[in-house]
Every structure is written in C-alpha cells, then in structure tokens.
Regions:
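N-terminal export and membrane-targeting signals
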Residues: 1-19
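Short, surface-exposed loop or secondary-structure junction motifs
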Residues: 110, 164-366
C-alpha cells in the first residue's frame, strides 16, 4: 500500500494487514560516497510573509519559546538527520506566534554547482497537491455542483464499483481502489521514460485492472487513484481544467503567487535540483525535470516556503488570509473529521491528516519531499522542504525532520508518521 504521499511503489502499513512493496534503497553511505555530500551549516533567513489575521498566540501552551538555545537545539537536530541520512538540502520554517520564528536553509540545492539551499526556491510538493484538489471539491459541494455522497459513477464512467464508491470515500482514502502508482507496468513505463506525459485515463487504467482491495468505506487505505478521480470530478463540475480551477478559485484568493499546477515538466526558477533512487536501476538520478503528469491531481504541484506557510493555516481553518471563508464551516468540520489509521496518533480526514493535533499533509515524488502542517492549539505552522525523496531506515525524511523539530518545539504535540516495520 502507498505511503501518505505520492510515491511510486514503496509502501507502508496504514492498515493493519498492509505489506510493503520494496524498491531498491540506496544506503546513506552510498549517497555520500557518490555525491560527496558534506555537512553544511544553516543560513538564517528572514522571510517576508503577509500578516495572517487571527494569529495571536494562545494564552498558554506547553511549548518553549524559540529563543537562542532552542534554535541551537533545532539546528543540531536538523544537521544530525542530514548527516545520518546524507540529505543534500532542506529548508525549515517554524512559526509560533508569541514564541518566535525559526527559518533555516541547510545544505545545497544543486549537487553540480554547489548552490546553497534557500527559502525562496520553488520546490515540487507531491501529495500536498491533494489538499488543493480536495479543497476544490469542497468548494463545488458548497456551490451545489456536487454532493460528497454522490457516487463517482455519476461523474466518471468505467470505475469498478463506481455506483457504490462516493466522493467522500475517495477524499477520505476509503474507496478500496488499487493505487495505480504501485502497479509494476506503470513503474516500468514511468522509469523507462520519466519525461513522458501521462493522461489521467491512462493512469486509471493501471488501477482498474486490479480487483478492489476491500468494500468501499471499510477502512482507510491511501491510494493516488482516488485523487485522479476527484480531479476529473472537479473538471466536470467546475467546467474547466483542474489547474485552471485551482488557480482561479484557490491560489488567487489565497494570495499564493508562487504556487502553480504545471501542465508539463516546466519548473519556474529559482528551484532546487531533486535527487531520487526511484529509478529503473535503483541508482540515484537527478529527477528535477521529470514530468509530474504521472501524479496530476494527486501530486503535480509546485510551491515555496512562503506560500506553504499561508496555505497550512488556510487548510486547517478553512479561511483565507483576510479572514473570509474559503469553504463553509460545515464542510470544514467534515474535512477535519478523521478516521483512525494503524499509525498511533494519526487520523485521515478529507484530503488532510491530523497527527497529534498537527493538521495538513506531506508530499513526496521523485526528487522531493515536503511537509506542511498547522497546530491550531498553538497557532503554530511547520513547513519542511527537501530536495531528495530517498528514505532512510525505512522512514520518509519529511517525517524524520517533522518529528525531531516538534519534539523540541511542541513536546506536547509531536508530529510522527513513523512506519511500522513490515515484511515483504
């Protein structure tokens, strides 16, 4: 089964009986030997971010302030993971109203020329795209164009069991449909020509040839197939291409000028180079210019630190930076109603997870990982951006960084999506 993001075949158990499907994983020592990664100190950067109404601190919280000593501990934690896992570059932003701000860029953005990581770089954000696609769906529900309990067969033909699978179940990862990105033929097609373009219908074909994993609604099982279908629903009900709908109805109202839904492999600059071992040979390659069409509504989008800081709170609250609603309160409550997963402390709602109070999503696709979450109880926001998706010790690095940072900054609310070891 798939991870909590848009990866290819590597999987984790978020249901009790799930088994991992392995890809060759390059050891950390191999990365360092091949690419010569050295520990690089952080650059402290001030990032201009628009004021977010309602961001005053709560009256009390168990979290420490982000003073010099705490920042030194955070620096050490990030550097430690980078050294252990041979991470080329990472940018971290942590905003805690009334307690301080921590923004750091570590390491390098480009192995070829040694350019440093920086907070203003564009990055591919993988499955964080799901938060935008599901927000579009919820907007259309608010406008009476769709109903969450409609069957997917009302909008998309040819879906196995489409008369029984609802839009709500798709958004909540409870459809039972096979994850197309775990199909062997899809993996070969992508890695043999990673710059090729896929259509949503081509991708769905890789899923629909497999039997359903369970009856709709039975449990949470992460599948990128669900989001492809919801993307098609948004296009049909919204009357325009998915990227255009998201741009006009979400990005522009939220002021997210550095976030986009690319229609091809185009990547605005400046951006970090991304490194992956999700390749045909298992060797590390530069995946920066791989075509993200294979992930489409599940993971094709691009953003930066500034925009993701704003988006984190928007997703968690359902309101725009100026305080006006992006979706109705009723649908926001439904979005945040989570179902438990096999990972302790983690639940999944409609296109978002809640991990010990942190609400948001992570993302991963070849070359990049990200984490964008908001903690309403402390009005805190955490964004982590990496230019590699190579796991270490069977764990995604965005989770490793998120856990290490929140153990220090918000010890009462530790973010962890650590995967249980699985056989196979």
């Amino acid at each position: 089964m798939a991870r909590w993001c848009g990866r290819l075949r590597r999987g984790v158990a978020i249901a009790a009986a799930a088994a991992a499907i392995g890809l060759p994983v390059a050891a950390g020592a191999v990365w360092g030997a091949v690419h010569g990664v050295a520990e690089v100190g952080p650059a402290t950067v001030d990032v201009a971010v628009p004021h977010i109404p309602g961001s005053a601190p709560p009256s009390a919280d168990e979290a420490p302030g982000l003073g010099p000593e705490v920042k030194r501990r955070l620096d050490a934690a990030v550097r430690g993971i980078m050294k252990e896992a041979r991470v080329p570059g990472v940018t971290v932003g942590l905003w805690m109203p009334g307690k301080g701000t921590y923004v750091r860029a570590f390491g390098i953005a480009d192995q070829h020329n040694g350019l440093p990581m920086a907070p203003d770089l564009y990055m591919r954000i993988g499955s964080e795209t799901k938060t935008f696609t599901v927000t579009a769906l919820l907007q259309l529900a608010d406008r009476g164009r769709v109903a969450l309990d409609d069957p997917i067969g009302k909008y998309v033909d040819g879906v196995p069991g489409g008369s029984r699978i609802t839009l709500r179940q798709l958004a909540g990862m409870r459809s039972g449909l096979f994850n197309y990105s775990e199909d062997e033929a899809f993996f070969r097609a992508l890695t043999s020509d990673p710059r090729r373009s896929f259509t949503p219908r081509q991708l769905l074909g890789y899923s629909f040839k497999h039997p359903a994993l369970f009856p709709p609604g039975q449990k949470v099982d992460y599948s990128n197939t669900n989001l492809l279908l919801l993307g098609l629903v948004v296009e049909k009900a919204g009357g325009r291409p998915l990227g255009d709908y998201i741009r006009d109805n979400i990005l522009r109202p939220a002021g997210l000028g550095h976030t986009l839904f690319p229609s091809d492999a185009a990547f605005p600059g400046p951006h970090a180079q991304g490194y992956t071992n999700q390749t045909a040979s298992g060797e590390i390659e530069n995946a920066t210019d791989w075509n993200p069409s294979w992930a489409w509504a599940a993971g094709a989008m691009i953003s930066d630190l500034r925009d993701l800081r704003v988006w984190a709170r928007t997703v968690a609250t359902g309101t725009l930076p100026d305080g006006t609603p992006l979706i109705s309160r009723a649908l926001q409550r439904q979005r945040l109603t989570v179902r438990p997963t096999a990972i302790p402390g983690a639940g999944y709602g409609l296109g978002v997870f809640d991990v010990n109070g942190w609400i948001g999503h992570n993302g991963s696709l070849p070359g990049y990982e990200s984490l964008t979450v908001h903690l309403p109880s402390a009005r805190a926001t955490l964004v982590v951006l990496l230019n590699t998706d190579i796991d270490h010790g069977g764990q995604e690095l965005s989770t490793r960084f998120g856990e290490a940072i929140t153990k220090i900054a918000t010890p009462g609310h530790v973010f962890s999506l650590r995967v249980r070891p699985t056989a196979g």
